[in-house]
């Protein structure tokens, strides 16, 4: 069983789903207004998230596998940090940008690793979530890579009530800084890049806030 299965179970809870989708709806309407962007063809990379569910509930089609060019690509929940090397990270960012049609917008979320280097600590994010009246605590356990200070291996422990725990291997991850993402997007031909002020992303199974960066191609 993968961590995706746990996330899918969270979205089956009506209260979790409704609260997160309403929050995402407000966020996205403000973001797209600020960027003067109207999403039509959307691709979601990585985990199912409140943004993709929100857009689907608005009657829009959201693909999880690329089949064409898109005007909107979502790379939330730190999708670009799931890489085992700098070259791998560059490649997944480049691959995402190639899926954008001219004028398309990429939205990505990342934590502020410069001011909060959580990847250097064994205990990462920890959070509580109630799914269908069952209590869960999600704890990130990190194993820093001492040969590469920007890399670490992550395992998520999910504690259920007071009698069970499941370990999910998330594999190797790599920090991504705003200037890095800006450079990689510029290398891919982006025309505009920015980090949204006072706009933060947080999924129900996370406690830490993530900054939202955008690129227009």
Segments (PLM) and residue ranges:
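Conserved class I S-adenosyl-L-methionine
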Residues: 1-48
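Conserved SAM-binding loop of SAM-dependent methyltransferases across substrates and taxa
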Residues: 48-59
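A short acidic, Gly/Pro-enriched loop at the edge of an enzyme's catalytic core
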Residues: 66-73
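A short beta-strand submotif of the Rossmann-like class I SAM-dependent methyltransferase core
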Residues: 73-79
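A short glycine-rich, Lys/Arg-flanked "PGG" loop and its adjoining helix->strand segment in the class I
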Residues: 89-105
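SAM-dependent methyltransferase
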Residues: 110-179
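C-terminal lobe and adjacent flexible extensions of AdoMet/dcAdoMet transferase-like proteins
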Residues: 172-217
């Amino acid at each position: 069983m993968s961590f995706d299965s746990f996330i899918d179970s969270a979205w089956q809870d009506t209260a979790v789903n409704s609260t997160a989708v309403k929050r995402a709806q407000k966020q996205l309407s403000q973001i797209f207004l600020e960027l003067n962007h109207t999403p039509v063809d959307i691709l979601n990379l990585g985990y199912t998230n409140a943004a993709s569910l929100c857009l689907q509930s608005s009657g829009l089609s959201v693909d999880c596998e690329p089949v064409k060019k898109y005007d909107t690509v979502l790379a939330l929940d730190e999708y670009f940090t799931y890489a085992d090397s700098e070259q791998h990270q560059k490649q997944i960012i480049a691959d995402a940008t190639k899926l954008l049609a001219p004028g398309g917008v990429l939205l990505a979320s990342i934590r502020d690793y410069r001011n909060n280097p959580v990847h250097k600590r064994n205990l990462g994010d920890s959070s509580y979530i109630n799914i269908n009246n069952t209590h869960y605590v999600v704890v990130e356990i990190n194993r820093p890579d001492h040969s590469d200070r920007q890399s670490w291996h992550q395992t998520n422990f999910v504690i259920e009530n007071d009698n069970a725990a499941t370990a999910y291997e998330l594999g190797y991850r790599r920090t991504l800084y705003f200037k890095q993402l800006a450079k990689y997007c510029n290398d891919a031909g982006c025309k505009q890049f920015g980090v949204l002020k006072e706009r933060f992303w947080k999924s129900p199974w996370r406690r830490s806030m993530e900054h939202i960066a955008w690129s227009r191609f």
